[in-house]
Amino acid sequence: MSTNNALRVFWKSREWNMKTSTFDSDEDILLLPKRKRFRKKKSRPVRHTKRHEEEQVYEQGTTLPCSICKHEIDLTGIFLHKKQHVALATLGFQWMGRKKPQPSVIAVQRQFMISKLLSSFMFTEKTLQSINNAFELLWKKQIPAYYKIFDNIDRSVIYSQKICHLLIKGVGICEDRNSTWKADMNDKFTVVSNFGNKPNVCFFGLFDGHHGASAAELTSMELPVLLLHQLSKFDPSYQMTTDEQQIINSFYTVFREEYAAIEDLFSAINKTEAVRCEYEDTHKAFAKAFWRMDRLLGLGRKEVSRVQWSGCSAVTCILEGKPKSPYAHKNWKRKNTHDGLAESSPSQEMPKIISGILHVANTGNVQAVLCRNGKGFCLTKEHTTRNTNERRRILQNGAVISSNEPYGLVEGQVKTTRGLGFHGNLKLKKSIIPAPQTISVPIDDLCQFLIVATNGLWEVLDKEEVTALAMTTFHMYKETYCPIIPNKSPSKGPLLFSTSEPNLTKSQSNIHVLFQYKSVSEVRVSTTNSKENLSDSNYSKYCIYNPENVETFPAETTHRKPCSEKVTDRPTSVNDVATNEKESDTKSFYEGAAEYVSHELVNAALLAGSRDNITVMVIFLNGSEYQLLT
């Protein structure tokens, strides 16, 4: 998505004739226009000021371009709008701008589609039901229930994260249970600063629980320690504490010698490959840690059901910061993939300034999007029945995908095809594998922010819409809440310039993949037997390695420390030096901005009709500093 499209998201006032109110019932609101004496109010108690500001924000309507038709759509109607796209396609209509076909035309087209279906050999009850559902959707007039959405929005919780990292300006996390649709909150997250006792190395993890929160909770606590143990095996700079090592040793009986021997065997096979990357060991560490975590979840700790144990989707990120140095001695060949990423191999020169490396591993439907130069890049793979490669693997493995809309469920249970846990159902576990998709990308001064979110956000908004909305809300925060921003160095140019400018090469508008394990769709492995799993040559290609330990979190680990929902003004001490005050003000600004953007993305997902738990993590990088100058 170009920068111009990103800035097309705008806020406009709604003509709702709604006044700021603290009434408890809808009846009082309906009588409001007749009670003219309320117009004479000029002041409001101080205790209502914050609530008044929030209601003013919600009285504004946010619109963003639909990723399908590019028309400006109100957030409250985007869920229905996308369903209408599907319904029109089902009935064979072409999109006609904002005009919807007349009811008589819709009825005639329905009869035509049914007649055509009956005369063919493709007739099924499911296809007939899809046609009828599309007809009902286009025939009826939908009226959104705003009052329900407003009540739900007020329940979001924001967490503040203090991070000391040369690449990170601020981190904010917001979550919402989405009480309209979900009774429990199954999302968990983890943030570890100075990961492995290394400065400028941070760990971020987000875990979306399925059938309960037990698996997600255990994974959020133990997976970072498992990963640290694997990294410390080949990189001594990653250090473990005594307590962490003791916890690792406590799982010795879970990972016996034969288990480690099989992992070492396939690790050695991979090492004989002709082409080897600098970050291959890091990717193997991710794979081993995921496999070991899955094995630990098989112990059934904290599980209460005898039939269906919990599982989780997971995304883990390690951000390594390095002093800026030219990479003139390395050349890279750029090759675009279908995701818009640029694979790198020796040949063509890549940007000479790289300030860090981001390693990402994911299983399931938790996604991470990196915004670079105003364009969003998805760094994760969606492991659900929507993915054709995953569907093929599931079916070839002998599993059944139900006929549930829109893409079916694995064994009629879940739509995720990879994840951690799910051990209670042996038939289901045979198909859901813990094999992570891993990737490493460079982080430079053009990288603005990283958004990591659970399925609750991505089921209603795609990466282009999320990126555009995040950039817009960041500008809103700057203009509305922080009118006075510390002066930035004039030597830094604006980041949000048009991608058509001559000073921006095509290679600079993409990101370069330093290393990536490719998913193999022909995986046919059962995860119930560790020896069989690890001995499969196809599977060892990307996911099996020597895990042997578990650790507890170091002191820098952050676990759900709530903060105030709005952090807009954090004055520094008068005794500080001027430069320290400037740095502190800048840090406070970005921390508040990250919290604000994460909160607005959660609200947008609720308004757009999300039906799942929502957790959004926003990480502002150095590139966001350039954005302030636009």
UniProtKB/Swiss-Prot annotation:
Annotated InterPro entries: PP2C, PPM-type-like_dom_sf, PPM-type_phosphatase-like_dom
Residue ranges of the TM segments: none
UniProt feature coiled coil, ranges: none
UniProt domain PPM-type phosphatase: residue ranges: 170-621
Origin: domain of life: Eukaryota
GO cellular component: cytoplasm; nucleus
SMART domains (alphabetical): PP2Cc (SM00332)
Pfam families, alphabetized: PP2C
Segments for region (Disordered): 557-578
Any single biological process term in GO: signal transduction
Family the UniProt entry places it in: Belongs to the PP2C family.
Protein name: Protein phosphatase 2C-like domain-containing protein 1
Gene symbol of the encoding locus: PP2D1
